[in-house]
Amino acid sequence: MEFLKTCVLRRNACTAVCFWRSKVVQKPSVRRISTTSPRSTVMPAWVIDKYGKNEVLRFTQNMMMPIIHYPNEVIVKVHAASVNPIDVNMRSGYGATALNMKRDPLHVKIKGEEFPLTLGRDVSGVVMECGLDVKYFKPGDEVWAAVPPWKQGTLSEFVVVSGNEVSHKPKSLTHTQAASLPYVALTAWSAINKVGGLNDKNCTGKRVLILGASGGVGTFAIQVMKAWDAHVTAVCSQDASELVRKLGADDVIDYKSGSVEEQLKSLKPFDFILDNVGGSTETWAPDFLKKWSGATYVTLVTPFLLNMDRLGIADGMLQTGVTVGSKALKHFWKGVHYRWAFFMASGPCLDDIAELVDAGKIRPVIEQTFPFSKVPEAFLKVERGHARGKTVINVV
């Protein structure tokens, strides 16, 4: 009997010790995912609830404020944004199939879950809040960024972006000026540097042809090519010739004064061609490259997203692969490289671009600014085409 009492007492003591350890010694695990909790607060924004023409744009005071979901994200208070041709196309449903796959790769959500959708890719503003893993930014920092098209856009009071997509704003620019550059700059940078392989160390003396030189991408491309000591030939209309010459273009060809092909025949062949126009230009433009010298034609006008919209994900990707593969092979046998390029969000690339801006080698080219209340008018302006720089929205 005494032995039984001793066993019971020992067991109770062990139970008490285990209970004390579980309560005191063990620390609860912490999920390092978000620094913000869901909010009930709202913000002003321009959104669309369906795809269509300009009348689908709707202003609301009740868009839910973004929150940080991942530890590498930051929330930016938008001071200025801009409208790009991609925004006009997305308003009409361009790329919806591929972009929705990126938003929801497991197809968990039902059709239309992307709405209300905020457009706008460029942002210049001030950091309001940082995720736990963000080391290079802090609240109060002035930053700029280009937001990928599958994310909620920048035509709102606040936007959340990944830390690797954002960069410190050039000190020499206002927010309005800075908002004109990120998307077009990164698109051109992708084509010239990442795909074309050109940089400040190998560009001196290279002959470069830019088709569609007076728009946002073209005006940036001229300046970065000249900053790297290339010889630039710009193709644009006569009324934009003064602009591109001021940006540094060595030769200017007016596409309205006659056949561009005929005018190019009087010039020496090129080492690099950047095509912002597309269409029939790619049938003749690569012929003006230097043969068997590593010369490259890069186009930013591709059927990638349209193929997916028209054929679906699988068939669209297959068609895209066949198209780019066959064209690259055909031009390879002609002694030139044929490539496609796309916008790539990158904070580190924006760091490099900011250095060029602050060094005075690149300046923003703004055609027109609009107040936040006039976003639909800005869309109509961009939709008309024939840009002479960028269209910027002052949000603050």
From Swiss-Prot:
Changing S167F: In OPA10; uncertain significance. The keyword Transit peptide applies. GO terms for cellular component: mitochondrial matrix; mitochondrial outer membrane; mitochondrion. Changing R103C: In OPA10; uncertain significance. GO terms for molecular function: NADPH dehydrogenase (quinone) activity; zinc ion binding. Changing P105S: In OPA10; uncertain significance. InterPro entries: ADH-like_N, GroES-like_sf, NAD(P)-bd_dom_sf, PKS_ER, Quin_OxRdtase/zeta-crystal_CS, RTN4I1, YIM1/Zinc_Alcohol_DH_Fams. Residues 1-40 form a transit peptide. Its EC number is 1.6.5.-. Changing I362F: In OPA10; uncertain significance. Changing R103H: In OPA10; strongly reduced NAD(P)H oxidoreductase activity. NADPH binds at S214, G216, V217, S237, Y255, N276, L300, A341, F343, H386, A387, R388. It catalyses: a 3-demethylubiquinone + NADH + 2 H(+) = a 3-demethylubiquinol + NAD(+); a 3-demethylubiquinone + NADPH + 2 H(+) = a 3-demethylubiquinol + NADP(+); 3-demethylubiquinone-10 + NADH + 2 H(+) = 3-demethylubiquinol-10 + NAD(+); 3-demethylubiquinone-10 + NADPH + 2 H(+) = 3-demethylubiquinol-10 + NADP(+). It is found in: Mitochondrion matrix; Mitochondrion outer membrane. SUPFAM superfamilies: GroES-like (SSF50129), NAD(P)-binding Rossmann-fold domains (SSF51735). NAD(P)H oxidoreductase involved in the ubiquinone biosynthetic pathway. Required for the O-methyltransferase activity of COQ3. Able to catalyze the oxidoreduction of 3-demethylubiquinone into 3-demethylubiquinol in vitro. However, it is unclear if 3-demethylubiquinone constitutes a substrate in vivo. May also play a role in the regulation of retinal ganglion cell (RGC) neurite outgrowth, and hence in the development of the inner retina and optic nerve. Appears to be a potent inhibitor of regeneration following spinal cord injury. This is NAD(P)H oxidoreductase RTN4IP1, mitochondrial. It comes from Homo sapiens (Human).
